[in-house]
Amino acid sequence: MAMAMANHHTLGLIFGILGNIISFLVYFAPAPTFYRIYKRKSAEGFHSLPYIVALFSAMLWLYYALLKKDAFLLITINSFGCAIESFYILLYFFYAPMQAKKQTLKVVISLNVGVFSILVVLIQFLLKGSNRINVFGWICASFSVAVFAAPLSIVAKVIRTKSVEFMPFSLSFFLTLSAIMWFAYGLLKNDPCVAIPNILGVILGLVQMVLYGFYRNAGKEKMEKKLPEHIIDMVMLSTLGTSDIHPIGAQQNGIKKSGSEDVKDDEETGNREKSTENSGELQPNGSTV
């Protein structure tokens, strides 16, 4: 019996460490997007809401981990999550237009300060002991389910357009892997609040990867037909991890016919940067325990 418990504890520790490592990588997924913002000295065309929501999620799970005993691995990853999402938001705020700054400030004050403070005060004064942990744990789980379910709009978009252009395989793979690790951790630690939301994460991740395999060739054929006609500048505007594609400018392919190598190089560089932005903004850590 003691040996079985020791094995459970060891396995839980292993899965928790692996979950931390993979979640660290996922948290860095938007880094190319913010490097692009830094280089442009402008955040115009981008939204801060996905990162505000990711910060709120990390704050919830961090507080839950502090209420529990023996939750060091939850504390480490969500402390890091709070730090890096705060950095992303500050960088966005620094380079955003004035109207976007005002909107970002309103949401941060309302959600990350207001709602979070109300939840903490209610939990601290209305509940005690294990009830406090259980109730707040299910609040965290419910929020994670909502965030995991949000990318269903991406799945619908892939099916509708038969294109996986805006659903990068690598990001879907690492999010699925992260969900598997945290599901196993929650199961071994007998923590349903951690395990249950990640069941949905695993299922959704597998669906995304299957769709990627099914539609990737169709997407390439469509892109080959479209590319000679237009060069479209797009940004991914995400809400709770969902993505909508908004064209903010289009040029005919022959708009600059100087024939210079610089123009061609600029277009190729732009396409690569846009591809980086798409993978960085698609699902910016919608969930992480």
UniProtKB/Swiss-Prot annotation:
Q: Does the keyword field hold Nucleus?
A: no
Q: Which family does it belong to?
A: Belongs to the SWEET sugar transporter family.
Q: What does this protein do?
A: Mediates both low-affinity uptake and efflux of sugar across the plasma membrane.
Q: Where are the transmembrane segments?
A: 11-31, 46-66, 71-91, 107-127, 135-155, 168-188, 194-214
The record's Gene Ontology biological-process terms are: carbohydrate transport; cellular response to abscisic acid stimulus; cellular response to osmotic stress; cellular response to salicylic acid stimulus; embryo development ending in seed dormancy; leaf senescence; seed maturation
Indicate whether Repeat appears among the record's keywords: yes
Q: Which UniProt keywords apply?
A: Cell membrane, Membrane, Repeat, Sugar transport, Transmembrane, Transmembrane helix, Transport
PANTHER family per UniProt: BIDIRECTIONAL SUGAR TRANSPORTER SWEET15 (PTHR10791:SF222), RAG1-ACTIVATING PROTEIN 1 (PTHR10791)
Compartments, as annotated in UniProt: Cell membrane
Per UniProt, what is the membrane topology?
Multi-pass membrane protein
Organism, scientific name: Vitis vinifera (Grape)
Q: Where is the composition biased (Polar residues)?
A: 277-289
> This chain belongs to which protein, by name?
Bidirectional sugar transporter SWEET15
**GO molecular function terms listed in the Swiss-Prot or TrEMBL record:** sucrose transmembrane transporter activity; sugar transmembrane transporter activity
Q: From which domain of life does this come?
A: Eukaryota
MtN3/slv domain location is 14-100, 136-219
Q: Membrane side Cytoplasmic: which residues?
A: 32-45, 92-106, 156-167, 215-289
Q: Which cysteines are joined by disulfide bonds?
A: none
Region (Disordered), start-end ranges: 249-289
Give GO cellular component annotations, separated by semicolons: Golgi membrane; membrane; plasma membrane
Its assembly, as annotated, is: Forms homooligomers and/or heterooligomers.
Please indicate the ranges of residues that lie on the Extracellular side. Answer: 1-10, 67-70, 128-134, 189-193
Note the InterPro entries from the entry: SWEET, SWEET_rpt
